[in-house]
């Protein structure tokens, strides 16, 4: 069986892995042009966050950002997501519907830093907020906490300006630690999650929330 993948006719009887997709698309100029937009959007967003971090550090003698990590979705991950949603595999559809091709995870020291950075980004006049999901104020049933923003920000090229979507996850060190371990347990170990494991994970999530609360109170006491 053959299928049109972003302008390429490809045999897909046995499926495609990341390496095969990358090889196929590496010579596709349109794919390279589109992914350049997302890479540049990540650089532009990271630059804005670094500026906010430096300004805050100068004013308050501490950094709100502990670390940042950016990523681009792999070709096969994009294709799988489009397949699941029944979308045609073409670039206009991808750009209009897949909002998390580019992503940045921002790890903060304290909960208040998360909301401070989100507020600063939302107040920048050329950033459009597409979606906002506050899992800190309203955690998921399993205890997961994080603040998710999907934004569009302008990227300036020699002859054009393009507004590119980027997903941002803002969380504290405790939130990130728990989310990373839970991801390992749930998805990488391929183990069935029973009620006992669910209960233990929820208790860990509650403990991490208490930890963040205590650290926030300590921060206020030291001011």
Give the positions of each predicted feature.
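Long beta-strand-rich cores associated with HINT superfamily self-processing modules
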Residues: 95, 108-215
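Terminal, regulation- and interaction-focused segments at domain boundaries
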Residues: 102-107
